[in-house]
Amino acid sequence: MIATGKIIQIIGAVVDVEFDQNSVPKIYNALEVKNKKIQLILEVQQQLGAGIVRTIAMGSTNGLKRGLIVIDLGHYIKVPVGQATLGRIINVLGKTIDNKGPLKNLDNSKLEYWEIHRSAPSYQEQASSQEILETGIKVIDLICPFSKGGKVGLFGGAGVGKTVNMMELIRNIAIEHSGYSVFTGVGERTREGNDFYHEMKDSKVLDKVSLVYGQMNEPPGNRLRVAFTGLTIAEKFRDEGRDVLLFIDNIYRYTLAGTEVSALLGRMPSAVGYQPTLAEEMGLLQERITSTKEGSITSVQAVYVPADDLTDPSPATTFAHLDSTVTLSRQIAALGIYPAIDPLNSTSRQLDPYIVGDEHYDTARGVQSILQRYQELKDIIAILGMDELSQEDKILVSRARKIQRFLSQPFFVAEVFTGFPGKYVSLKDNIRAFKGIIGGEFDNLPEQAFYMVGTIEEVIKKAKLL
């Protein structure tokens, strides 16, 4: 029998509903407001006793009033999964928001629905891989390589290029990699979502991407759950035996939505005002993003860093779950070097001679040691000038500046801004070029020739024109 209740209190996105004491809904159950004018789903967060449950609205509570009838659907929020979602934009509840009509399977078979709250795969079901996933972005492939089935975080403050880097990764991997991708926009700008849709359409990869959006203007409950909707779609593809790419932009907004919900529910805040359940909420999401014996989920997550402070509880909690961290630096962006990835602050578990091989490992560490030494010499250069350096250090500084410029790269998705055609650089060419710079093969070339190019052949060609 369907349990019905009525709304007794509305405070913003929090709605209290009273049920009969013998039919109180379970935690996380979906409730539906029965009204012709209002289509609203609520999710149970707390049982307050005396048959009253406290819920969070998944949409706007405008027009709600006390006394409205609410139905317990008897299950968690369910969303459509499978190939019907490819090339479409859906919201947290699985409803289409791209004005292209309802979702349907190509063979007109019945849509499959999965609940968004699911258990993470057991230890026995999980599988790990050490296969490297080539991205075509020089600095990433060299310094912080991605693994197939791994988790990657793009860390950066406001406006240093997290979304552009993510769009380039999707474009490169989705074109080179034949599998499916799921893009989940959590609390980001609607304009970015629109740009992204058109970018995928122009790159002709839209039919391989499922888009799930919960933008900045949505209520906190919606932004808190939209990541689970995207993840559930990715899990379905993985369980069909596919290798899936899951992109989440932005994990910080997921944390922030949790903070808002926590405050609305009256919980005592912890450090810096975050929710006391921050680590648990992050774990609930991250533990499900994993590879099994059936298929893999490789995830790339943008992480906004408040005030460029990597020790803030939100990015700090995310660090623990990642295999590779790509750190974007405002100082590098200020030099006009894009992508503004900091090679000294970015790390990867895959950068191990047993996984990537000795040549790759030695080249990456050689690049880092030269850049580190250049960093140390910067103060001396600023105070005393280049003339006070030893001959050895002068050569090192020259190579470091070439490396720094050669780590820049024109992106396909940023062609309209940079005016340079995008470049995809293979790992083999990448290692060969940096090995040559470290070894002094290109000491005679001017450093300007290394800026905004792809391969070392382009540098040589550009140097002849200078």
UniProtKB/Swiss-Prot annotation:
Is Transport a UniProt keyword of this protein?
yes
Localization recorded for this chain is: Cell membrane
Q: What is its EC number?
A: 7.1.2.2
Keywords for this entry?
ATP synthesis, ATP-binding, Cell membrane, CF(1), Hydrogen ion transport, Ion transport, Membrane, Nucleotide-binding, Translocase, Transport
Q: Where is this chain primarily localised?
A: membrane
Bilayer topology annotation: Peripheral membrane protein
What single Pfam family name could you report for this chain, choosing any that match?
Answer: ATP-synt_ab_N
> Catalyses which reaction?
ATP + H2O + 4 H(+)(in) = ADP + phosphate + 5 H(+)(out)
SMART domains in the record: AAA
Where is it found, in Gene Ontology cellular component terms? plasma membrane; proton-transporting ATP synthase complex
Q: Which residues bind ATP?
A: 156-163
CDD domains documented for this protein: ATP-synt_F1_beta_C, ATP-synt_F1_beta_N, F1-ATPase_beta_CD
The molecular function terms in GO held by this entry are: ATP binding; ATP hydrolysis activity; proton-transporting ATP synthase activity, rotational mechanism
Q: Which InterPro entries match?
A: AAA+_ATPase (IPR003593), ATP-synt_VA_C (IPR055190), ATP_synth_F1_bsu (IPR005722), ATPase_a/bsu_AS (IPR020003), ATPase_alpha/beta_chains (IPR050053), ATPase_F1/V1/A1_a/bsu_N (IPR004100), ATPase_F1/V1/A1_a/bsu_N_sf (IPR036121), ATPase_F1/V1/A1_a/bsu_nucl-bd (IPR000194)
Record note on quaternary structure: F-type ATPases have 2 components, CF(1) - the catalytic core - and CF(0) - the membrane proton channel. CF(1) has five subunits: alpha(3), beta(3), gamma(1), delta(1), epsilon(1). CF(0) has three main subunits: a(1), b(2) and c(9-12). The alpha and beta chains form an alternating ring which encloses part of the gamma chain. CF(1) is attached to CF(0) by a central stalk formed by the gamma and epsilon chains, while a peripheral stalk is formed by the delta and b chains.
Say which family it is in.
Belongs to the ATPase alpha/beta chains family.
Function noted in UniProt: Produces ATP from ADP in the presence of a proton gradient across the membrane. The catalytic sites are hosted primarily by the beta subunits.
Q: Which NCBIfam families match?
A: atpD
Question: What PANTHER family does the database record attribute to this sequence?
Answer: ATP SYNTHASE, ATP SYNTHASE SUBUNIT BETA, MITOCHONDRIAL
* Protein known as: ATP synthase subunit beta
